[in-house]
Design a protein with these regions (language model features):
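Ferredoxin-reductase
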Residues: 9, 14, 18-101
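FNR/FR-type flavoprotein reductase catalytic core
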Residues: 95-207
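OB/S1-fold single-stranded nucleic-acid-binding modules
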Residues: 1-7
């Protein structure tokens, strides 16, 4: 017999894989090196994204006329208004960063997916969120969706990148920087930090 309460069970949901044409409806940029781009369009009817860690294929044409596919987390889906928000990292000089740098209202692209959602209940007593810049959209979305009774610790390589955008503080959460010389990926750095942290005596979820 499972000891996991129903409200703490992870649920997996599958969706029909559909390609959709989307149009840029709004572009915002901030000092954290990200562009927040909103997309709309009739093809978004029926779109679903139930988990903060979902991913879609963003399909666009680069400067050479080549079709490029990149994975992105839906930062927010407003089903009522039919608006999908994606966040693009502008550093690194990649094709997607270049596209986002030039993004303007009226430009079009395609998205595919998500194939499904792994829904991690927000009713955990404590959440540990770890990531580098590529994880910021998922972390921001999770923090915004946590209930007021939740508590979270966030470990990042660049805490200022999270602070540059307003994140609703419905839940109680605190931000810490992971430092290492030379820099390494968070699974490496966070393991040492987690061993030094006083973990709360409650049902927790790390992500």
């Amino acid at each position: 017999m499972s000891s996991i309460l129903p409200q703490h069970r992870i649920e997996r949901v599958r969706y029909e894989l559909i390609k959709r044409k989307v149009t840029v409806s709004k572009v915002e940029r901030a000092g954290d090196g990200f562009a927040r781009i909103s997309f709309s369009g009739e093809d978004l009817a029926g779109f679903q994204s139930q988990s903060f860690d979902d991913h879609i294929k963003f399909i666009f044409t680069d400067a050479r006329g080549q079709t490029v596919l990149r994975d992105y987390t839906p930062s927010h889906w407003d089903a009522e208004q039919g608006v999908l928000l994606l966040e693009f990292a502008l550093h690194g000089g990649g094709a997607a960063a270049s596209w986002a740098e030039q993004a303007a209202v009226g430009m079009t692209a395609m998205i595919g997916g998500p194939k499904g959602s792994m829904i991690i209940p927000a009713q955990q007593d404590w959440h540990l969120l770890l990531g580098d810049d590529s994880a910021l959209p998922a972390i921001r979305r999770r923090l915004a969706e946590l209930p007021a009774a939740a508590r979270a610790d966030v470990l990042l390589l660049r805490p200022a990148a999270l602070a540059a955008w307003s994140v609703p503080r419905q839940a109680e959460w605190q931000l810490q920087q992971v430092t290492s010389q030379p820099p390494c990926w968070l699974p490496c750095a966070s393991g040492r930090r987690r061993r030094a942290m006083a973990l709360p005596g409650a049902r927790a979820r790390a992500g």
